[in-house]
């Protein structure tokens, strides 16, 4: 190195370039050295911003200010103590560096750039600098390291705090304090190391790789986050495979060991942050052998793959070939037998990431409901303009071999017709049926027509049915028709609540499956049935999935649709009954036609109108008469208003929030006699109640009133509809998904605000009454640090633990983005610790090191437009309830009058209803979702055995697992383990 004059302890310097690439490279260089960005000014973006432009040069296009902060005494949380309060007054020298990008560099030609002074900075860890720059760094002595930055500036790093010092200075000279806080802080840090040593000493760490492959889908990031953090929690090393199978082939930097903080904020990101790519090389054995070598070199013998059927098939093939691939690697001399001995078997676990929802054996795949939500949102927008011009719109959606998106979108958007691959339309005849359906709906008063076409739609001769083919048919009808191809907008955006929840739970279960894996275990695929996470053999699921395409190619369309799950088939039949077959083809005999009442009870909830619409359309297509009881039971008592609903009344209700027929919290017991009178007057044969706990209570009151009021001897059922999800006996209520989506958007926004201001915490209050479901679910899918629910009372110990967890998070904070923190509190979690009081306690304990704010979304949680999932579920439940009423009436007809155990009622010759039995428990029921089952549960049994009447909820806390998983992923359990390790060490 040339001998240069040295400028020691420079507090401020400015360097200039007119090369943008060099500008960025220099910033990265100083970031690597530990400098932090404190200002990033862009003349074109921030020129009018007086705060950002303050202190910048007039000729700067961009300026980035980097600071190396002084070392000084820190408190228990690792935050700097103000100098006037510190017991140790020593401080190291800080430095501010201004890097400027200008139009043209102002360098005098006579200036000799070889006479540059060397700038010297103080560092307590010279070896680390050499490690970071092994080729550039030159160690001149034990206390001096020389470097050149990308602009050619000479820099030395000295271990001497001052030029006059004779011995190196350690960081303890600045950080060391005599306070108890500092001792605790260091002990906490040591506890982390102790915990890692303890976990590592018992057995060799399991190393797991996680990758995303094939087409991206919303929710993949949530799955990766769950795998990474769950793996770390269970003492594993977790690696992310970047760029899918291509990353497996390349190895090296594409296999990155992940830390806890690496996946912070990933829940709210769309796509996949670790990338995805299709690899032709991996399809060859040579490519798979190369991938095996890369995994073994990192010690990895478990792989979690999130992708479609092709990706999962490749993964399972990789597993079966693994032993022979390892033998080939040994034969090639890349590894010895001893080196590969621990890696004789490869564990594979599959997660289905696909917006098509085309995997057999699972109800939904990661990303499917997010894509459906995008479709419904777009079609809702299209409907608005279509009605204005009285147009027809043909909308093409994805689904090459699976019509799930098209079917669900058809139900959720009130489409007139759908085309799906599983049910091919008759060649040359489908045009006539399409035109007949659209013309019939127009004649009933509809102003627009919506047709949903899956991209893989075809006729029974395997000819493609395109959006333009459909358009041509509608033009023949004389309709002004437009085509909209949604394309990749369906993949875009962040994941909805359902997909975040699904990906998180499946990611956690994937790690558990890896740890439980044996060489004899078939590769598992993590799926879901109704509300329950399940495992199923990967090979069989993929085989069934591919057999659908085979059946279609063989023109066996009955087999193709039979291979879909029962829910798919049920919903397809429901769509036909409510839309296509409203031509009188399904009318029942006059003697079997019923009068069915529909009433909304309780607070407004999304999808009340969607359920009423589906029930009405199904009734009309079968000849029943649907009657809307206006304004709840109080409206019936006060005015007796009951309206017979027509097709045009409900045609546009599929995407309307609130209640079009009115709702309130009045219950049936306010005047059972008057209610019985109007039931008798309208000759009701059945009743559907939509509502929450008030609806649940009303159903019980009507059932109990059968002794005094024989008219109540009719089949009655409740469709749970409440954002609180507090109806006993069921795990799902209409409106919950809409509520959770609203909360996801709300919390994403406030977390962004918290991240922008860096050290900021929000305490968010959510609804739910005495049920902690919404709070627990929201905490899980938003990455909340803590969740306060009524089921687990808040106490000072739990608050203290949360404060410690927050301090630990912020102690390691380096000013990165995505570091806003969220705490979720149920509105009834405590009568003492209110949302504001919690915020005040945490704020006081933070001693100004981070800010705390409250956020209360209130009735925003009820949502506006119902979510696509709520719309589809509403339709499914409504049709099931009509069938329930039909079946009970059939049962009555088939029963002899002498059998008093079965509900019976008939009209006499004067048209009066004659009850023949006091009550029948099973005929008054609640439609319930429990795990993987949908069933009708008698209200009498639910009220007696499963209802906490005082707290207005069920006894079962079916969401308890969400809190446990939330504690794992937030780091709470990790912190507890560290504290326990520290306590054990102190003993």
Curated annotation (Swiss-Prot):
Record region (C-terminal regulatory PFK domain 2): 595-987
Uppermost EC category: transferase
Active site: 356 (proton acceptor)
Pfam family, one: PFK
Residues binding Mg(2+), per UniProt: 309
UniProt superkingdom: Eukaryota
Membrane topology label: Peripheral membrane protein
Sequence segments annotated as region (Interdomain linker): 581-594
Modified residues (Phosphothreonine): 450
Cofactor(s) annotated in UniProt: Mg(2+)
BP GO terms, sorted: canonical glycolysis; fructose 1,6-bisphosphate metabolic process; fructose 6-phosphate metabolic process; glycolytic process; proton transmembrane transport; regulation of intracellular pH
Pathway stated in the Swiss-Prot or TrEMBL entry: Carbohydrate degradation; glycolysis; D-glyceraldehyde 3-phosphate and glycerone phosphate from D-glucose: step 3/4
Positions of post-translational Phosphoserine modification: 3, 166, 179, 185, 189, 192, 217
Residues the entry annotates as binding beta-D-fructose 6-phosphate 1: 354-356, 398-400, 455, 488-491
Annotated region (N-terminal catalytic PFK domain 1), positions in chain: 1-580
Documented EC number(s): 2.7.1.11
Cross-link position per record: Glycyl lysine isopeptide (Lys-Gly) (interchain with G-Cter in ubiquitin): 89, 625
Positions annotated to bind ATP: 215, 278-279, 308-311
Activity regulation, free text: Allosterically activated by ADP, AMP, or fructose 2,6-bisphosphate, and allosterically inhibited by ATP or citrate.
Reactions catalysed: beta-D-fructose 6-phosphate + ATP = beta-D-fructose 1,6-bisphosphate + ADP + H(+)
Family from the record: Belongs to the phosphofructokinase type A (PFKA) family. ATP-dependent PFK group I subfamily. Eukaryotic two domain clade 'E' sub-subfamily.
Subunit structure: Heterooctamer of 4 alpha and 4 beta chains.
Protein name: ATP-dependent 6-phosphofructokinase subunit alpha
Organism: Saccharomyces cerevisiae (strain ATCC 204508 / S288c)
